[in-house]
Amino acid sequence: IDERDHRFVIGERTSEGFYRAEASLDSAIARGLAYAPYADLIWCETSTPDLDQAKAFSEAIRAEYPDKLLAYNCSPSFNWKKNLSDRDIARFQNELGAMGYKFQFITLAGFHALNHSMFQLARDYKSRQMSAYVELQEAEFAAESQGYSATRHQREVGTGYFDELTQAISGGQSSLSALSGSTEQAQFDED
């Protein structure tokens, strides 16, 4: 047992042989302090969105390492509205920033966004057929002015690069290129 963890080990073992340990703010702080000399930033993980715990963690780490960067997982596993008011949610990240949490992230945000949007598209496609997809495509076109670039999916995934690579390897004789002459290239304007 690592000496830094010893006071948190309960003494029991799991059926797999792992020691059971106390999951607490104190154990998180002790672990953070142990890693602080070696880590670029220290990640705080709480079981609910809890500014009091985040503050206690920050104060303990920064008391010994005042310039240490902190990270906080604004977890999608939290039921945010069940735990915080709209006002508290709106100020949550600013409060974290004031405590020194410079890297704030949502693990799996893309997973949730992708799955929810695909669910909506499938539901709408069932009832409105192609009109549902065209609505999505028009939203993509509208988002291009804000930097969205995935409307042209072949270009987005690097098809042009692999076409050039294939041509270089084959001495310009490959019939496997995908982007040149494609429907995407023909129908989507390059601005």
Predicted regions span which residues?
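Alpha/beta enzyme core
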Residues: I1-Y72, P76-F78, K82-F105, F119, ...
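Short acidic/histidine-rich active-site segments
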Residues: I106-F111
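C-terminal helical cap(s) of enzyme catalytic domains, especially alpha/beta-barrels
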Residues: N115-M130
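Flexible C-terminal active-site loop/helix
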Residues: Q129-S180
